[in-house]
Amino acid sequence: MAARNIGIQVKAPEVECDDKNCPFHGNLPVRGQSFVGVVVSDKPHKTVIIKREVVKYIKKYERYERRTTKLAAHNPPCIHARVGDIVRVMECRPISKTKAFVVVEKLGRIDEVKGEE
């Protein structure tokens, strides 16, 4: 079965899977928000915990602060993201109580990015 077009410009995974909640090989539609984060945990089954940093301006102090947000995202077997991977996640329908996002692309490793500094 070929990977279907999910509506955004991402590279489809080479490996096929039989997960019904995969946006490429199943029938999970994606819509809404899309952002990049780092995988901090992959212990739950078919789930990864993503950490995302946001820089917010504090008007009173005329400074910026760094805020972090963690959220759970579905990890299809064809993408198979691991701890330390930089991934793109996209919003989808609620898959479980805490999961309403799905990993659509692996962008690299955090070690490779930090090694260039």
UniProtKB/Swiss-Prot annotation:
User: So which domain of life are we looking at?
Assistant: Archaea
GO CC terms in record: cytosolic small ribosomal subunit
Fetch the Pfam families from UniProt: Ribosomal_S17 (PF00366)
Which GO biological process categories is it annotated with? translation
Example GO molecular function: rRNA binding
Q: Which keywords describe this protein according to UniProt?
A: Ribonucleoprotein, Ribosomal protein, RNA-binding, rRNA-binding
What job does this protein perform? Answer: One of the primary rRNA binding proteins, it binds specifically to the 5'-end of 16S ribosomal RNA.
UniProt family annotation: Belongs to the universal ribosomal protein uS17 family.
Subunit organization: Part of the 30S ribosomal subunit.
What PANTHER family does UniProt report for this protein, alphabetically?
40S RIBOSOMAL PROTEIN S11 FAMILY MEMBER, 40S RIBOSOMAL PROTEIN S11-RELATED
Q: What is this protein called?
A: Small ribosomal subunit protein uS17
Q: Per the UniProt entry, what species is this protein from, by scientific name?
A: Methanocaldococcus jannaschii (strain ATCC 43067 / DSM 2661 / JAL-1 / JCM 10045 / NBRC 100440)
